[in-house]
Design a protein with these regions (language model features):
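Anionic ligand-binding catalytic core segments
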Residues: 1-120, 124-231
Length: 231
């Protein structure tokens, strides 16, 4: 890694999986939805090369050509497998309320959208020049529910309330209550509204209809669970 001249930007280029169709396009659509929900992510785009799309995203640990000190959740505390424990880390690092609300939004989005690969290396913290820690923008936000034996199943790496699947709206609300997150109901409802736009966004990205159907069905099932008054 080298220093860049003024005006240049550090990027990460994620090449499409040669064995799975539309990996870049799906990640881009999930990026669009996550940012529409209010989740912080670095600017990203699809980069076409020789007829294939690849996912290009700015690095969150580089600003104005300088490297920011960052550490994954795993490197800071190791073997964290509950969202409740990430909130504990946030309190220990004294991050502002905004970051904790951002973390709650990520948890809700991940559980509804099927981002099951939410392990402790997919959460990071940045120490800024003032010496204060902040949670990093989200990254690696994409559908990972198993549908062709290459991705994880529907169980999350990071559990909520000792459950690694979505059981009820109360499961999410309890996570909010125990961590003093305000307006949890409206946050959940806003994320649901955005995720209901998946099919149109996926068609705009020219994703194959059978794959759209698979992801859409998962999202609909999760929304049904959240809206079931008996759960």
């Amino acid at each position: 890694q080298i220093s860049l001249p003024k005006g240049f930007i550090h990027y990460i280029l994620k090449f499409k999986d040669p064995d799975i169709l539309y990996t870049a396009e799906v990640e881009f659509v999930f990026y669009q939805m996550a940012t529409e929900c209010g989740i912080d992510m670095e600017k990203s785009q699809l980069l076409p090369i020789s007829g294939d799309n690849h996912f290009l995203t700015e690095r969150f640990d580089r600003k104005n050509g300088k490297k920011l000190h960052s550490a994954t959740l795993n490197s800071l505390y190791g073997n964290v497998d509950r969202y409740e424990d990430i909130f504990t880390v946030c309190r220990k690092l004294n991050v502002p309320y905004y970051d904790k609300e951002h973390l709650f939004m990520r948890a809700v989005f991940n559980y509804i959208a099927g981002v099951t690969d939410d392990h402790d290396k997919n959460f990071s913290f940045i120490m800024h020049e003032d010496g204060k820690w902040r949670i990093s923008p989200a990254y690696d936000v994409t559908f990972t529910v198993n549908y062709i034996n290459r991705f994880k199943g529907d169980r999350h790496v990071m559990s909520i309330g000792f459950e690694d699947t979505l059981k009820s709206r109360e499961q999410l609300l309890n996570l909010a209550r125990t961590n003093d997150i305000h307006n949890a109901e409206s946050i959940i409802d806003n994320i649901i509204k955005v995720l209901e736009s998946f099919e149109q966004k996926a068609r705009d990205a020219n994703i194959d209809q059978p794959l759209i159907n698979i992801i859409s069905q998962h999202i609909r099932d999760q929304i049904t669970t959240l809206n079931d008054p008996n759960r």
